[in-house]
Amino acid sequence: RGSYRPVTRVNMEMYEEAKKMFFSDKRVTEKNTHVIFEITLANLRSEGKINERDFLDRAELLCSLGQTVMITNFQEYYKLVDYFSEFTKARMGLAMGVYNLIQIFDEKYYRDLSGGVLEAFGKLFYKDLKVYLYPLKDMETGEIITSANLKVHPRMKELYKYFKFNGRIADITKFDPDILEIFSRKAFKMIVNGEDGWEEMLPEGVANIIKDKRLFGYNRRRHEGKRKKVK
């Protein structure tokens, strides 16, 4: 799951490394595995409505990279896992960043459930599911945050430790520390504002696709105009 607005080097590294870890599991058969890039409608809302052009740009870019894209209206991860469990009883893997995992352990997302957070986590982790966690760099301290040192709400700490110590959360240990400061929202802002430098934040070939298809509001004249002013 991601915003993919646009897809970045971080997104693809997270995917590639999580896939390697998933396939190394003896319970996983690679030929029977389906990889899906999911975008939730909850992350496509702009000023209270769906921005269709923005949504299509994200999906088109991922599809051009050969990926399968699924659009859902599941804001909570447990609903997503519950949906997939209708089609398979085999092991499932979720690749995500630290920030998203911390959100999973936020009680406010489960207030509408009669069983609260316990019901949600029962649905999420009852299935044969494993989370592959990509690290986060603290921009203030420079500290690399992993499953070992991330902080959840005190009331959720023991629940988190339970899933961590039972092997349901695995750290992605192979990563490029030089790209941890790349964020989709920053790249998107640079594209819209006609700034230079966003191309290096994206996987090889992605910048050319954005330029050729004028995705995410890319405007060649705006970019060229910015360069002339700088000169």
Q: Across the structure, where does each feature detected by a protein language model lie?
A:
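Nucleotidyltransferase catalytic core that binds NTPs
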Residues: R1-K231
